[in-house]
Amino acid sequence: MHEWTQKRAIGHFHPLRPAIKTIVIHQSSVCARSVLQHERDAIVRVTLSSICTSDLHIKHGSVPRAVPGITVGHEMVGVVEEVGSAITSVKPGDRVAVNVETFCGSCFFCQHGWVNNCTDPNGGWALGCRIDGGQAEYVRVPYADQGLDKIPDSVTDEQALFVGDVLATGYWAAQISEIKEDDTVLIIGAGPTGLCTLQCVRLLHPKRIIVCDIDEARLDFVRLHYPEVLTTTPDCLTDFVLANSDHGGADVVLEVAGSKTTFRMAWECARPNAIVTVVALYNGPQSLPLPDMYGKNLIFKTGGVDGCNCAETLKLIEEGKIDTTPLITHTYALKDIEEAYRVFETRLDGVIKIAIKSAE
């Protein structure tokens, strides 16, 4: 079992900082300030980061590709400190959002926008999983010409914090779901990813949006911030969807909860020939009861986020069309991140998302 703790790093000290603080899953690791390793790298001084449910999956050993001893964290914004010789898209001093995906931009999959499947050895989800991530004071970003986006001057760090991961996931999910204006869209799960997905679905103006969650506090959040959205709980879901759809079920279902029962719930509430987009990351296998599903002719879409639209979402934030700041319910200093993890994992005090300030 890996030990989950906070460590002070040794070596490669920043002249103004006697130690570099990170949060790691470690066995006998030593953390140091990030240094350039490639001409397309950049070093970012992290100003604000966040804890993602995926970090909890790593903590509990549910992500086999995660490297023991890695500094976790893949939701972050910061300031460019140093760039490799091939980087011209950003420069030291630029405020940037960091993409959860590492991608080369030139392989077959990147050229088609499927950056999660980048064929580079470091491609896909690397930061905070296979290489050191951003719950730290500094992070090295490979392929920084692809993975960093400048934050507009009028956009705060808090507004941009989720651009590289959870908001990118919601935007990607909404885009691939082929939502039309006459559609009834069902979103299962009102956690952080579900709420970001909801914001991006709203941009497409479907006829109805239904959000289902087991947590009344999260449904209250939806009712407060998005009063036009219909809400329900799992025990009422089937009848509620039938009463609020035109063709015997939802036209599009986005499964963002990832529990033992929500996958079945998703396809059962879909009308025949509907699209079911599986956004959630499951801890275990799911049953695919093909005899029960036969005849519904459903289209399933699933997989890791192709997060290559961060510049677009930053523009939407700048224009006031997306605002994820209400999701930040708690803020902690990096030195207090163990407490932040405790609050986030046990869902205390109405927590939705936590912002971690690296600077003291």
Label the model's feature ranges.
Residues 4, 14-17, 22-24, 264-268, ...:
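C-terminal hydrophobic helical "lid"/dimerization subdomain
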Residues 17, 34-49, 62-111, 152-155:
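Glycine-rich beta-strand-centered segment in the early N-terminal region that forms part
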Residues 93, 182, 228, 249-250:
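Local beta-strand N-terminus motif with an aromatic residue
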Residues 106-188:
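NAD(P)H dinucleotide-binding glycine-rich loop of Rossmann-like/cofactor-binding domains
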Residues 150-239:
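Mid-domain Rossmann-like dinucleotide-binding core that forms the NAD(H)/NADP(H) cofactor-binding site
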Residues 206, 224, 259-321, 355-360:
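Glycine-rich phosphate-binding loop and adjacent beta-alpha segment
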Residues 241-253:
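A short acidic, Gly/Pro-enriched loop at the edge of an enzyme's catalytic core
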